[in-house]
């Protein structure tokens, strides 16, 4: 196929990770000619989702010096005990038999319902390519147990984990946080400016349990977090409540690997060309035309702009990698927490874990079959923490012991791996734009900011991902753009249109 490609492009994007796919879609959407290449045979790179077989094959792959996925290992476990209520006995063979029913993320994320990504998906109309599942519970560990943190007003008053007094205190505190910012000169802002958010909580005389709820699950901050940042995080949480469910979070159906592909679809709709299993062998800058010359599979391509993921170009492959994110991925035949957290066959839950000193943290995402990420009767646990070493199992040991040592979770499969990042920025002497690797964050804010920044440098006067019209809104040459297809309108607008037409007819009769 590469032989049939045009030789000239406005933009060549190398790598199909989330950030690269955003940039490719944004370029194609404003009418730029885009070529999107990836040396892998699948979309997404470390942002991808895999079937069970494909994940094992990926973890078994020999690690190349520039590969972002490293230190990988996995283990199949024999079941120590089987529940009498289990409809199916799970083991390695039965799990692999349903390999295609799995969608296992290397780099899982949760979306704030009013966060940057959701707003971008709606604004650009890319949301039509994606489906989401509301997260059922935001949890924390309290006195050795996993408990649900009440988010909405109804949750607060229905929860059995708080006393009546604590419920009132929590509602009063959340109301104060929600009002913060409307008057930045209020007494609290002045009194606690330069102090910590924990000091503010203590001054409100909330109980230890409420303080844990706020610090661990709502603001998701630490003892040294400033008052201003703690308020901003709490407001972000509250601002996403009540949109799509009881919690402020969403998870992509069929795994996070669907999201880069959503942007790739938009890029292709607007003329972007895709070539998988195609590497770039060499890149040079033509000093006369100020264009890039890219050599790939024996063909020379010309591009005005080049964007690449780290490690995908010859010049960036020599950069040393260092551990960045330590990951654990587990498959179990039973969920974490009590029955209340897992009604109807298992909840989609989020849990923030802290070490004993509170200096380190990890995020756990529990997925059930309701997300389309695994077969019914199985559960996926995604565990993520900033890397401290080349041994992800050691980095995560303090958290896995909290989760599994005293729980009834029946682990069938466990895997550990590291997502690495370059120890220094890729050389930019040739003016190639290199995207950042995945960072340790809950949502996609950093990746979107990175995509916006690179796009703005290439096309400073262009809008980043303007709304794409729906198919019925597209006017073909020769059609009357003012003509409306009544059947494509919502019912209320159809009624208004009918009334307007009748009124017009009556005016004609009167005249």
From Swiss-Prot:
It comes from Drosophila melanogaster (Fruit fly). PANTHER family: CHM, RAB ESCORT PROTEIN 1, RAB GDP-DISSOCIATION INHIBITOR. One of its GO terms (cellular component) is cytoplasm. This is Rab proteins geranylgeranyltransferase component A. Gene3D superfamilies: FAD/NAD(P)-binding domain (3.50.50.60), Guanine Nucleotide Dissociation Inhibitor, domain 1 (1.10.405.10), Guanine Nucleotide Dissociation Inhibitor, domain 2 (3.30.519.10). GO terms for biological process: intracellular protein transport; neurotransmitter secretion; positive regulation of protein localization to endoplasmic reticulum; small GTPase-mediated signal transduction; vesicle-mediated transport. One of its GO terms (molecular function) is GDP-dissociation inhibitor activity. It is found in: Cytoplasm, Perinuclear region; Cytoplasm, Cytoskeleton, Spindle pole. Belongs to the Rab GDI family. Binds unprenylated Rab proteins, presents it to the catalytic component B, and remains bound to it after the geranylgeranyl transfer reaction. The component A is thought to be regenerated by transferring its prenylated Rab to a protein acceptor. Keywords: Cell cycle, Cytoplasm, Cytoskeleton, GTPase activation. Its main location: cytoplasm. It holds the Pfam family GDI.
């Amino acid at each position: 196929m590469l032989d049939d490609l045009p030789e000239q492009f406005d933009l060549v994007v190398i790598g199909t990770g989330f950030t690269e796919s955003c940039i490719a879609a944004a370029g194609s959407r404003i009418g730029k000619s885009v070529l999107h290449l990836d040396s892998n045979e699948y979309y997404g790179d470390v942002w991808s989702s895999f079937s069970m077989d494909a994940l094992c094959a990926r973890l078994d792959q020999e690690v190349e010096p520039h590969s972002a996925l490293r230190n990988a290992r996995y283990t199949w476990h024999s079941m120590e005990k089987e529940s009498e209520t289990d409809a199916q006995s799970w083991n390695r063979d039965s799990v692999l038999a349903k390999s295609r029913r799995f969608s296992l993320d290397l780099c899982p994320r949760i979306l704030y319902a009013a966060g940057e990504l959701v707003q971008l998906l709606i604004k650009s109309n890319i949301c039509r390519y994606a489906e989401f599942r509301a997260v059922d519970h935001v949890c924390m560990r309290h006195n050795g147990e996993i408990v649900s943190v009440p988010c909405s007003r109804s949750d607060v008053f229905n929860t059995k984990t708080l006393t009546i007094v604590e419920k009132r205190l929590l509602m009063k505190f959340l109301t104060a946080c929600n009002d913060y910012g409307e008057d930045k000169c209020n007494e609290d802002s002045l009194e606690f400016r330069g102090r910590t958010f924990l000091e503010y909580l203590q001054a409100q005389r909330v109980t230890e349990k409420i303080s844990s709820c706020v610090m661990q699950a709502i603001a998701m901050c630490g003892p040294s977090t400033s008052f201003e940042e703690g308020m901003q995080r709490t407001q972000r949480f509250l601002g996403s409540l009540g949109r799509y469910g009881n919690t402020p979070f969403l998870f992509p159906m069929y795994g996070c690997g669907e999201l880069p592909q959503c942007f790739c679809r938009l890029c292709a709709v607007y003329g972007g060309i895709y070539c998988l299993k195609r590497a770039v062998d060499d890149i040079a800058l033509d000093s006369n035309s100020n264009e890039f010359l890219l050599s790939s599979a024996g063909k020379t391509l010309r591009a005005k702009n080049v964007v690449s993921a780290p490690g995908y170009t010859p010049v960036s492959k020599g950069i040393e990698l260092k551990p960045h994110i330590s990951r654990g991925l587990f498959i179990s035949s039973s969920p974490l927490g009590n029955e209340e957290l897992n009604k109807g066959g298992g909840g989609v839950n989020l849990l923030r874990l802290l070490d004993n000193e509170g200096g380190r943290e990890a995020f756990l995402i529990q997925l059930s079959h309701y997300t389309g990420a695994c077969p019914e009767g199985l559960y996926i646990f995604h565990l993520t923490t900033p890397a401290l070493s080349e041994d992800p199992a050691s980095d995560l040991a303090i958290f896995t012991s909290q989760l599994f040592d005293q729980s009834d979770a029946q682990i069938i499969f466990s895997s550990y791996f590291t997502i690495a990042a370059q120890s220094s920025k890729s050389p930019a002497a040739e003016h190639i734009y290199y995207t950042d690797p995945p960072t340790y964050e809950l949502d996609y804010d950093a990746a979107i900011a990175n995509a916006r920044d690179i796009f703005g440098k290439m096309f400073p006067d262009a809008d980043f991902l303007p709304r794409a019209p729906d198919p019925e809104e597209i006017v073909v040459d020769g059609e009357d753009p003012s003509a409306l297809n009544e059947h494509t309108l919502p019912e209320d607008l159809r009624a208004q249109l009918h009334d307007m037409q009748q009124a017009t007819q009556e005016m004609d009769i009167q005249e």
